[in-house]
Amino acid sequence: MAPLRILISNDDGVFADGIRTLAAAAAARGHQVTVVCPDQERSATGHGLTLQTPIRAERADELFAPGVTAWACSGTPADCMKLALFELVKEKPNLVLSGINHGPNLGTDVFCSGTVAAAMEGTLEGIRSLAVSSACFQWRQFQAAADLALEVSEQAIADQWPDNLLLNLNIPPCAREEMGALRWTRLSIRRYDEQFSRREDPRGRAYYWLAGEAVQDLESAGEGPRDWPSDVAQIHANSPSLTPIQPDLFWRGPLSGLPQLKLKDQLVR
């Protein structure tokens, strides 16, 4: 394969081991690598954009492997992608990689994920994009995830990766030889026990810390081959999960499945 122009971002920030391992692995395979990522932790920011304050970007090449061009940006992951594509990167990338996230991005958690949002921004701009996550917050060995992300991306590009298709890759916390087979998976629906820790500042004013724990994972109600496992089940089986995601969130069921609405004696149809 000819060298690719790869743009890499994340939501864990410029000092995260995951993104540095991914960038080094891509450069070692001969690709032209540019990193534009947040200058600090921006996890769970979703697809948020910075509109009320200026966005700053500083070069950060010294934090990465030789040959990698890097920028640290004061904005969100989506800001980083927009700034990269429309200002910092002079030639359009062939591939966007986001990650390696320090923790899973499974099921409906993708709606909160800054990692997935960065990849989705690439998808919306017509670039093949893959988000990759290590499915354990404590696991800090990222080489297997980096290698698998690049293998999947290179093969998907060689096999005519469809437009408007984001690939979401989650890797179990183990060595490559201990993993099961990579499989296509469906998104789970995750239910959380949301908890807030209420505290008071020195002036007696209340503030809150959000803490939640996934207590239930439901099978996806969406379309897709029913023999595919859910992404959560695949990770629980100590196997990597690859979920195809589209930006189109449109309802695909029948009209009869929607609420019947009648406004001013006129049926909504």
Curated annotation (Swiss-Prot):
Protein's job: Nucleotidase that shows phosphatase activity on nucleoside 5'-monophosphates.
EC class name: hydrolase
UniProtKB keywords: Cytoplasm, Hydrolase, Metal-binding, Nucleotide-binding
Cofactor note: Binds 1 divalent metal cation per subunit.
Protein known as: 5'-nucleotidase SurE
UniProt GO cellular component terms: cytoplasm
Keyword Metal-binding: yes
List of residues binding a divalent metal cation: D11, D12, S43, N101
Named cofactor requirement(s): a divalent metal cation
Gene3D superfamilies reported in the protein's UniProt record: Survival protein SurE-like phosphatase/nucleotidase
EC number: 3.1.3.5
GO MF term set: 3'-nucleotidase activity; 5'-nucleotidase activity; exopolyphosphatase activity; metal ion binding; nucleotide binding
Similarity-based family: Belongs to the SurE nucleotidase family.
Protein's cellular compartments: Cytoplasm
Catalytic reactions of this protein: a ribonucleoside 5'-phosphate + H2O = a ribonucleoside + phosphate
Pfam families, alphabetized: SurE
Organism (species): Synechococcus sp. (strain CC9605)
